[in-house]
Amino acid sequence: MAPISIADIVAALPAEDTWGPATSTDNMLQGVPYAPFSKGDKLGRMADWTSESKDQRTGRQAYNRNFRDQQVYGAGSSNLFSIQAAEDESSFSVVDNTRTSAKRTFGRGGGTVFRGRAQRGAGQRGGRAGFQRVGAGRGQGDRFYDNRGGRSNRGRRFGWKDYDKPQRTREPSVNVRPDWTMLEEVDFSRLLKLNLETPDGEDVDSYGFLYYYDRSYDKAPVKGAERRLQSLDRAAYNVTTSQDPVIQELAEKDAATVFATSDILSMLMCAPRSVYSWDIVIVHQGNKIYFDKREGASLDLVTVNENAIDAPLELAESSAKQESINTPSALAMEATFINHNFALQTVAESQDAKVDMKNANPFYNASEETEPLASKAYKYRRFDLSLERDEEPLNMVVRTEVDALLKNPVNGEDQQLIVKALNEFDSKAQGSGNALDWRSKLWSQRGAVVATEMKNNSLKLARWTTQAVLAKADGMKLGFVSRANPRSAAGHVVLGVVGYKPRDLAAQMNLNLGNGWGIVRTIVDRIRALDAEEDEEKVKKYVLIKDPNRPVLRLYSVPANTFEEDEEAAAEEEEQKAEEDEE
């Protein structure tokens, strides 16, 4: 039998007939084939064999609407090749008797978007300090969003319109110059693992005098008779370490190897709690190390709500003229003014009840100063930072400060106090950190008020507590000062005072002093290791900077004359201003 040819089979098929379903006359429009379609269909290709399929894509592209398959013309209508049902089922429906709940939606005004946070420059005389000007704007893609640490590996939770919030970028407290060399970068997670148990220390010498604390401030104020905060002219000094004449004398006597002041050391010991940028100058001369602060540093200013989630905004970012008194720099100047005057007002200035230290104030010159001295005692204390492996002991001398005395009602002994003040600017304003209204809640819900302050001002309270422990003070007095008018920073009232023991307050705040001493010892060891092979007589200078946008410390090696020109220029400006005032 001859083989069958496929060509013969195809040729034998009827020419007038076509393969596939029979053509319906309903799909003909004036003799032209017509396919029903929907106006909502997208125009596309009949078939595209070159584009990648949805199954070939991975990751987020498989679900991205920009990468969906092109729809074929008429795909939104009924299937042309579907089986027609014998009966019309278009009128058939199923009744759903399940109970549905209304979905709650938020309107346009349901949320507020806050953009950025920064600092603005401002200086002050006497413990001069300031914030650097920072502009607002979006950061780079690899920048942290207002990073507080702790959630870097697990992401972060997003809130209402969080996508529309720009990253909060800040500038460093001091600009890094081209001739600086970065030696090391340490993140806070590594610093938190350090620990060094250090004894309480011993007193080396004491200077100044103290007045007794006025106990009437501990009582709840009578309604309608609030005490106004007074502005008192008293001379108080906050000299940097290397310019302290007492420390210079102790260094010549080899009383210690490392020298610092309590305000500088407390910032270093509480560094993992900081958010804003700060810097410390470290000078290594011979075998002595000095922790200094530069001219115009921000260490002396008291920040407000630095650790709050919704911290105060700069004027350029908040774009509200009436909020100019609630910017970070303005609030810092206001808080510094409040702390200075509150410590002076809460003591009873009486020459009969004045207690002198062993030596007079080392910074006061009666021939030049016209203002009387403030109640202040400077205690120089020595701490042992030695380890078992050290061949020679490593001692550190710290200048600490005490503000007032208090009689112990039991044994009648004098107790040394540190007096500080927390300030409230406006509980309803942006940047308040969801704080309670102090006027109505301070005495009825004091625990909640203090807990909120510990959260919003974690660094500030930790520094004050550390300074009290370094000074071996017997107690702390925390005042609560509020504005007389929330829209004005001119007048303030004292709402109350709460007393704490430094160690108890440190335990409540989960403040680990051993971790702080571990940070100090690590920095000292690093400086000594860098200069091990250098000439001992050569002066080496370093700058330790807190990164403004990340929880990181950076150590830079700088020329020995760094910041000296700035100090000379500042001194010349002061002389010119003094001459103009005299004229």
Curated annotation (Swiss-Prot):
GO cellular component terms attached to this protein's record: cytosol; eukaryotic 43S preinitiation complex; eukaryotic 48S preinitiation complex; eukaryotic translation initiation factor 3 complex, eIF3e; eukaryotic translation initiation factor 3 complex, eIF3m
Record localization: Cytoplasm
Biased composition (Acidic residues): 563-583
InterPro entries registered for this protein in UniProt: eIF3d
Subunit structure: Component of the eukaryotic translation initiation factor 3 (eIF-3) complex.
Region (RNA gate): 298-312
Entry remark concerning the domains of this protein: The RNA gate region regulates mRNA cap recognition to prevent promiscuous mRNA-binding before assembly of eif3d into the full eukaryotic translation initiation factor 3 (eIF-3) complex.
GO biological process: cap-dependent translational initiation; formation of cytoplasmic translation initiation complex
GO MF term (any one): translation initiation factor activity
PANTHER family: EUKARYOTIC TRANSLATION INITIATION FACTOR 3 SUBUNIT 7, EUKARYOTIC TRANSLATION INITIATION FACTOR 3 SUBUNIT D
Xref: Pfam families: eIF-3_zeta (PF05091)
Keywords attached to this entry: Cytoplasm, Initiation factor, Protein biosynthesis, RNA-binding
Name of the molecule in the record: Eukaryotic translation initiation factor 3 subunit D
Stretch list, region Disordered: 116-150, 561-583
Main location: cytoplasm
Cytoplasm in keyword set: yes
Skewed-composition ranges (Basic and acidic residues): 140-149
Known role: mRNA cap-binding component of the eukaryotic translation initiation factor 3 (eIF-3) complex, which is involved in protein synthesis of a specialized repertoire of mRNAs and, together with other initiation factors, stimulates binding of mRNA and methionyl-tRNAi to the 40S ribosome. The eIF-3 complex specifically targets and initiates translation of a subset of mRNAs involved in cell proliferation. In the eIF-3 complex, eif3d specifically recognizes and binds the 7-methylguanosine cap of a subset of mRNAs.
Homology family: Belongs to the eIF-3 subunit D family.
